[in-house]
Amino acid sequence: GPLNIASYLMGTTEFLTLMMMEPDKAELLLRKITDYLKAWLTLQRETFPSIDGIFMLDDIIGFMGEDDFRTFGLPLFKELYDAPVSVRFLHNDAPCKVCAPILPEMGVNLFNMGFEVTLAELKELTQNKVTLVGNLPPRDVLAKADAAGVYAATTAMLDAMPDKSRLVVSCGGGMPPGVSTENVNAFIRAVREAK
C-alpha cells in the first residue's frame, strides 16, 4: 500500500516524522505513490482480464492513530480499492485495532491480520462486514509447537468464535518457514473438526 511504499522509500521513522512535521510533503509523496499504484493495478487487470481482486500489504497503518490514518491513509486506500473488482484484500499484521473499524469504509472485504487481536474481537470491530483471514500465531504455534499443540491452539481459537461466518482460517500474518507437514495436517484436522 502507499504508506508502506513511502516507508520503504524514506525509512519508517523518517516517513512518520515527515507526516507530522511537513504534512504537505508527505501528502505529495503519497499522491505520487497512489497514482503509480492505481496505474499498476489497472495495467494488471488490463493485461490479465481474469484478475478480479486487489491484494495490498500495508503494515504502516498499524503505527498510526485514527486521526492520522483518516487524514493520510483513508482517502488513498478508498481510491485504490474503488476498482471494478470483487475481492479487496488487505494484509496488515501490525496492530490493527485502529484500522479494523474503518476497513469497510476503506472498501476492504478480506483482511489478513496479526494474531494479537482475537478473531471474535475483530468480528466485532468490523461489525462482521469483512471476511477475516487468520489468525493462529505463525511462528510460536504453527512453526514451533508440535502437532498436538497446533491442534489444541487451532481448536481453542475456533471454539472462542461463536460465529464462524466470514472466516478463512489461516495463520495470522504469513506462513513462516520451517512448518512441518505434521503441523499443517494438525491445523487442517482441527479446522475440519471444528464445531
Predicted stretch roles:
Residues 1-195:
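Active-site loop segments of alpha/beta catalytic cores
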